[in-house]
Every structure is written in C-alpha cells, then in structure tokens.
From Swiss-Prot:
Annotated stretches, region: Binding pocket for hydrophobic ligands: 215-319
Free-text comment about domains: The second albumin domain forms a deep binding pocket that contains palmitoleic acid (in vitro). Palmitoleic acid is most likely not the physiological ligand. Instead, this pocket may accomodate the covalently bound lipid moiety of Wnt family members.
Family to which this protein belongs: Belongs to the ALB/AFP/VDB family.
Alphabetically ordered keywords of this record: Disulfide bond, Glycoprotein, Protein transport, Repeat, Secreted, Signal, Transport
Gene Ontology biological-process entries: protein stabilization; protein transport within extracellular region; vitamin transport
Chain's role: Functions as a carrier for hydrophobic molecules in body fluids. Essential for the solubility and activity of lipidated Wnt family members, including WNT1, WNT2B, WNT3, WNT3A, WNT5A, WNT7A, WNT7B, WNT8, WNT9A, WNT9B, WNT10A and WNT10B. Binds vitamin E. May transport vitamin E in body fluids under conditions where the lipoprotein system is not sufficient. May be involved in the transport of vitamin E across the blood-brain barrier.
Keyword Disulfide bond included in the entry's annotation: yes
SMART domains: ALBUMIN
Name by which UniProt lists this protein: Afamin
Domain of life: Eukaryota
Length: 604
C-alpha cells in the first residue's frame, strides 16, 4: 500500500518532497535563515552532488578536492560575508572552482563550458550531463560485514562516497531528493549493521528508497524536459493540474500565487543549481503551510510538525475533499455567450483558469489527460471564435472532452488486457520487442530498462479502481524516459516527432508508430549467438537480464521478424541454456548448439 501511495505522490505532488536531512526547527522560525544554515552545514554533500552530476566521470578523489575548496570558501565567508567573493551565487562559485581545477576541463572535455559565463555556462554544464551511464564502471558492492566496518571506521567518507556514486548515476535528480536518499541510506546502514542477518536486512530496506529514487527521477526529468523543450507554459499547466486535483478548494488567485513559487523553483533544480533548488523547495513548503486554511483541510497536523516529518506527512495526506458548492461542471466556459471575449482579453490566464476548474472537478483523470482536454478546448475555441455563432459551436465542448478521454481510456484498457493475458515475463518481452522495433538506436541497457518500467507501471496500476489515471500517468513517465532530457537526444525521425511535437498528445502519437523504417541493422551478429558455460553460473536474476539483452539484441539484428518468430527464437535460447547446463560438458554443448540457433535465426 505504501508503494501505491508513493506512486500516487510521484504523479500528483512530487515537488512537495523535502530532504529528510533538512533542519529540525518548527515552521514558525525564519525559514530563510534555517535553509541557509542547512546549506552551510551541508556544503560537503551539496558540492559532491553538483560536481558528480555535472562531471560524472570525475573520480572520488577529484570530488574530495573540490569539497575541500568549497569548505574553505564557506569558512571564509562565514567569518566575513562582506568579502567581494562572498556576494557571488553559490553555483557560480562552484562552477568557477570546477573550471579552475588543473587539467580537469581538458581531461573530461568540458573546457568549452568554462569559456562561457552566467546562464550560458550553467546551460552548457547541464547539457554536458549524460543520461546513459554505461560509461561508468559498475556500482561498487561491498559485503554487508565490510560495509558496516567501513561505516564504523569512517562514517563521513563512507557516506560521501555513497552520495558521489548515486549522484553521478542520477545526473538529473534534484538535490533534495538525493539528500533524502542519503539520509535513508544512513538510517538503513545503522539499523542493518545491528542485525544478525545483515544481507537480508539491507536487501529488504533498500527496495523502498530505490523505488523512491527511480520514481522521482522519472518525474523530475519529465518536468524538466517539459520546461526546456516546450517552455514555461507547459510546466505551468502540469502544476495547475496537479495542485488543483490535490487541493480542490484552493482559490484560483491563491493557486496563481503558489504557482509563482513552484515554477521559479524549477529554474535552479532543472539547471542543476543545487543551492537554489534547496531554497526553492523550502519556499514552496513554507508557502503552503502559511496559507493552509485556504489551501487544504488535510494538512494542519502536517504543518505543525518539524520540517523533516512535514514533507512526508503532506505527501501521504489524502486529496482534499471536494467543496460542497463545487458544481459538476463549470458553465462559464461552455454556456456563457461571451467566452470568446474573455479568452481574447487574457488568453493565458483564461486557459489557466479553465484547466484549474476542470482539474479540480475531475480527480479521476491523469495529468496528461487534463492537458489533452485543455488543448482540445483551446483548439475548439480557436475554431468557434471565428464562426458567426460561437456559443452554438463551443456548447458542444463536453462531447469533445468525452471523446478525447474515451480514446485515452481505450489505450489504457488495451494495455491492461496485455497485463491480464500475459504473465509478467511475457509482458516484458512484449514491450521489449515493441520498444526495440520503435527505437532500435537506443542502447540495449536503455531498452531493457524501459521494458521493465512498462511492466512495473501496468503491474502497479491495472488492478486498481483508479486504473486509468495510474496507468496513463506512469506510462507517460516511461515515454518521458524514452524521449530523454538533453537537447542533443535524437533517436529516429518518427520517435523524435512524437517527443518534440506535442507534450500532451505524445502518448497517442507513440500508439500510431510502427517499426522504424530508417534503421539499418548490423551486418554481423556481433557475438549474439556465442554462448559459454558462464551462463550456467548466472543466478536467476542475472540469467533473466541476459535473456532480456538477448531478445533486444536479436530484434536489433533482425528487426523484420514478426513477434511470433522472435518469441520462438527466445524460447530456443532458453532451451539451449537449460540443455547445456545439464550436460556433462556445458562448454562443448554450447559450442555445438550455438551455431544451430544462429542458423535458425538466419533462416527466419
């Protein structure tokens, strides 16, 4: 149940999360001062996150050098804030120090960013981030006993190293989220190191916050992509839909005021300005709790808590009750004779208010669906307001809205039918084949990740009463992962079109896609059919990963094969592994059977 609530939170209210390591003073203390003290106290973590996210290839030793420089800068400024260098923005100082590290810009190929200034420099460092972390070595894993001993011997270095490894593998995750994960990691380490069954404890307790990290990572990347690719207006619309559903009694003027804080937060968070991101997050929470009477009846107890517990409390609070006087439909947008005049007076504000009114009346709809409805309404008014009798035209708006939702509902129902009819593994193979045919240019790691995410979305949502909103929200996040966040992300013309043309309708765009016609498969099998006895040593999970990779690489090699033929070859691969691992000489068996499977593939 907790996982389900977290899923709902990710979709509906992710920007309320606060770091569990934020200071513990009650809310009536000066928030700006508290937040600044937190930043000063945590300069080490903040520096590690920023550096490791900007320059993912940098070694831990290089990161430690920057931490030392930034700590000295902090101490100097705490002693005398009137010094000229202390008036600079923290992120500016950080980037200056990164650029000043001898030989580093040339070593990691970011010297071109150091030649830029201000916003252009920040943006350059942002675009230097790499979503594909295949370039990094595997995440180091320690034996539980060794992990506990390392923590006991040098807590600071142990935690710093953890923050470094997680940050460089999650370059687009907001700093407060990473700080939350780090705090939970330390709590888990303390608890599990006291247990007899340490390995089991670590495995059990790690799952929830790994899920938390993955879920928020997807949403944050999606939100930042919306901001950077489609502009502030789309991000504003997303936030209107989210807040109006969560807090249906909030007035439109109050919502507009809150949106100013929420939207400004994204500039720092999306650019990777760790300090501004933390400040922005704290400001949003303070705003909500200072106006709670006009925002929600569900958060009073939450706002009386200290900051570490406050964010979690609000996350898990229920959506506020719908106001008794809230009609089922807002007539002024459909039945009024002067809709066109109101729209023309201030189109942005008019459309924002429509989205607010529609969202607070429809808690059962997904965020993407609410954006689709808003787009349909906007296009309808564009058409109607040029007619002789506009009211007669837009009075049928609800029919258009219902048609739009019906189309989206059918897509979700079709996906949940796949979930009902196929087992978990077969469902994954279905999506691995489809995704690889659509975007064979993506790496094998990315495609296997996307396939697993699709399965998780359907497994999480398809048995719920709120199936539609849950599936539509989570699948939209998977498509956001596919589209990526960086400006230099180009996959193929058809996929790029869906990613870049219309944020609200990209789901239906992807539904209409077929296998990529521009893709040229490799001329050789590149070792795909070369198997060895090490397959017999693979544990179930590792063997499953190898099967997933085999299927994706098979589709890349033979994209023209139908799904049934691909499934048949995957079954043959499974049979070969089972047969040879039971043989007296597994290596000899693989040597004999591998060419047969390759020949069958060629003949298919």
């Amino acid at each position: 149940m907790k996982q389900l609530k977290l899923t709902g939170f990710v979709i509906f209210f992710f920007f309320l999360t606060e770091s569990l390591t934020l200071p513990t003073q009650p809310q009536d203390v000066d928030d700006v001062r508290i937040t600044q003290k937190f930043i000063d106290d945590n300069i080490g973590y903040i520096t590690i996150i920023a550096f490791a996210q900007y320059i993912q290839e940098a070694s831990f030793e290089e990161v430690e050098m920057l931490v030392k420089a930034m700590t000295e800068y902090r101490d100097k400024c705490l002693a005398d804030r009137t010094l000229p260098e202390c008036s600079k923005l923290a992120n500016e100082v950080l980037l200056e120090n990164i650029c000043a590290m001898e030989g580093l810009p040339q070593k990691y190929n970011f010297s071109h960013c150091c030649h830029k200034v201000d916003f252009e420099r920040r943006l350059c460092f942002f675009h230097n981030k790499k979503a594909d972390i295949g370039l990094l070595p595997p995440l180091p894993t320690l034996d539980p006993e060794e992990k506990c001993q390392t923590y006991k011997n040098n807590r600071e270095s142990f935690l710093n190293n953890y923050v470094y490894e997680v940050s460089r593998r999650n370059p687009f995750v907001f700093a407060p989220t990473l700080l939350t994960v780090a705090a939970r990691f330390e709590e888990m380490t303390k608890t599990c190191c006291e247990e007899q069954e340490k390995a089991n404890c670590f495995q059990t307790k790690a799952e929830p916050f790994i899920y938390y990290l993955k879920a928020l990572s997807s949403y944050q990347k999606n939100a930042c992509r919306a901001l950077m690719k489609f502009g502030r207006q789309i991000l504003q619309s997303i936030n209107i839909a989210i807040l109006s559903q969560k807090f249906p009694k909030i007035g439109f003027k109050q919502l507009t005021s809150l949106l100013e804080d929420v939207s400004s937060k994204y500039d720092g968070c999306c650019e990777g300005d760790v300090v501004q991101c933390i400040r922005g997050r704290s400001k949003v929470m303070s705003h909500i709790c200072s106006k709670q009477d006009s925002i929600s009846s569900k958060i009073k107890d939450c706002c009386e808590k200290k900051i570490p517990e406050r964010g979690e409390c609000i996350i898990y609070s229920n959506k506020d009750d719908r106001p008794n006087d809230l009609s089922l439909r807002e007539a002024k947008f459909i039945e009024s004779d002067n809709v066109c005049e109101k729209r023309d007076a201030d189109q942005a504000n008019f459309m924002a208010e429509f989205l607010y009114e529609y969202s607070r009346r429809h808690p059962e709809l997904s965020t993407p669906e609410l954006l689709r409805i808003a787009k349909v309404y906007k296009d309808l008014l564009k058409e109607c307001c040029n007619m002789e009798n506009p009211p007669e035209c837009y009075r049928h708006a609800e029919n258009r809205f219902n048609e739009t939702t019906e189309k989206s509902l059918k897509i979700v129902q079709r996906e949940c039918e796949h979930f009902q009819n196929l087992g978990k593994d077969d469902l994954k193979y279905h999506y691995l084949i489809n995704l690889t045919k659509l975007a064979p240019q993506l790496s094998t790691e990315e495609l296997t990740f996307l396939g697993k995410e699709m399965v998780m979305a359907l497994t999480t949502c398809c048995t719920l009463s709120e199936e539609f909103a849950c599936v539509d929200n989570l699948v939209d996040l998977v498509l956001g992962e596919l589209c990526g966040i960086n400006e230099n992300r180009n996959i193929n013309p058809a996929v790029d079109h869906c990613c870049k043309t219309n944020f609200a309708f990209r789901r239906s765009c992807f539904e209409s896609l077929e296998a990529d016609k521009t893709y040229v498969p490799p001329s050789t099998s590149q070792g795909l059919f070369t198997f060895h006895a090490d397959l017999c040593q693979a544990h179930n999970e590792e063997l499953q990963r190898k099967k997933d990779r085999f299927l994706v690489n098979l589709v890349k090699l033979k994209p023209e094969l139908a799904g049934e033929e691909l499934w048949s070859l995957l079954a043959d691969f499974t049979n070969v592994v089972e047969k040879c691992c039971k043989a007296q000489e597994p290596e000899a068996c693989f040597k004999e059977e591998s060419p047969k499977l390759a020949a069958k593939s060629q003949a298919a």
